[in-house]
């Protein structure tokens, strides 16, 4: 084995020289230079100061503005709540441990940090599944009388939490375990060694099938059908131009969220699967650290995409930040009025 396994850890370095120590008790500066740990701490600090305000504002603005309380936005708000869980339960812990060069909070803290990181990532994934199914039902109309309402949204939110807990909770109760990974200052599921006592192999297979492959398959199917339907509707002009434009904007926003999720999480999942299928092979701590920390940036992109690509939510956000007045909205209103007046003048002129 090219690593050192302990009661609650696996350090990706052989202990032939005797330098490997428990990541819960000693700094791990034999794995990387101290400046690398400082860089990780600075990165986590950035995610905290950027992730908390934008996710909190997303929640606050939606609660303050009644017109934003639509069923679809329930799912998007659920994403913001999950991101806040990651910020408070995971990022603050990881920043502090990175500053010290090892996981100072012990196995219990590792369980907490790993649980919140996994829970947030899984809620995001299952939210995207619910959004994909919603888009498929609304645009493709497999059920002609279906209308996505408040009850559907509440059930969708509950579903995301149940599925996320089904993935994040088992390691807390003995099916697999959370251990420090990479440079040993953040925690994730154990896919490094078989460990028959915690049934690691069966859990990793269950996780990759039920909580990664299946949801991505559902998302791919829904958007595959959706793209075909949108093309057909555009060609046949079955819907009004305004309706088509609105559906396209929402669909585009959700698709970009899916792509962003894949960009953030597929590298981490791919590296984890590689390590699982090549247990005992040699790999450096940076090999797992970079994709693991990159995946944490997912707490930023969902609210940014939602705000940037949704004009109504963007205007409400600006109104809230500007103490109840949106200066940009006035300019837009003036230009819209001017264009309408011009159009009216043109239409009133009789042909020569």
From Swiss-Prot:
Q: Topology with regard to the membrane? A: Multi-pass membrane protein
Swiss-Prot/TrEMBL GO biological process terms: phototransduction; visual perception
What is known about the tissue distribution of this protein? Rod shaped photoreceptor cells which mediates vision in dim light.
Residue numbers spanned by region Disordered: 330-352
Quick check: keyword Lipoprotein in the entry? yes
Q: Where is the lipid attached (S-palmitoyl cysteine)?
A: 323
Query: What post-translational events are described?
Result: Phosphorylated on some or all of the serine and threonine residues present in the C-terminal region.
Record's compositionally biased regions (Low complexity): 334-352
**Cytoplasmic topological domain:** 62-73, 134-152, 231-252, 310-352
Question: Where is the protein found, in the record's own terms?
Answer: Membrane
Per the record, residues carrying N6-(retinylidene)lysine are 296
Residue positions with a glycan: 2, 15, 200
Molecular function GO terms recorded = G protein-coupled receptor activity; photoreceptor activity
Which keywords appear in this protein's UniProt record, sorted alphabetically?
Chromophore, Disulfide bond, G-protein coupled receptor, Glycoprotein, Lipoprotein, Membrane, Palmitate, Phosphoprotein, Photoreceptor protein, Receptor, Retinal protein, Sensory transduction, Transducer, Transmembrane, Transmembrane helix, Vision
Report the Gene3D superfamilies cross-referenced here.
Rhodopsin 7-helix transmembrane proteins
Q: Which InterPro entries match?
A: GPCR_opsins, GPCR_Rhodpsn, GPCR_Rhodpsn_7TM, Opsin, Retinal_BS, Rhodopsin, Rhodopsin_N
Membrane-spanning parts: 37-61, 74-98, 114-133, 153-176, 203-230, 253-276, 285-309
Membrane topology, Extracellular segments: 1-36, 99-113, 177-202, 277-284
Keyword Membrane annotated: yes
Q: Name one GO cellular component term.
A: plasma membrane
Which Cys residues form disulphide pairs? 110-187
The main place the protein resides is membrane
Functionally, this protein is described as follows:
Visual pigments such as rhodopsin and porphyropsin are light-absorbing molecules that mediate vision. Rhodopsin consists of an apoprotein, opsin, covalently linked to 11-cis-retinal. This receptor is coupled to the activation of phospholipase C. Porphyropsin consists of opsin covalently linked to 11-cis 3,4-didehydroretinal.
What family, per the record? Belongs to the G-protein coupled receptor 1 family. Opsin subfamily.
Designated name of the protein: Rhodopsin, freshwater form
Q: Which organism is it from?
A: Anguilla anguilla
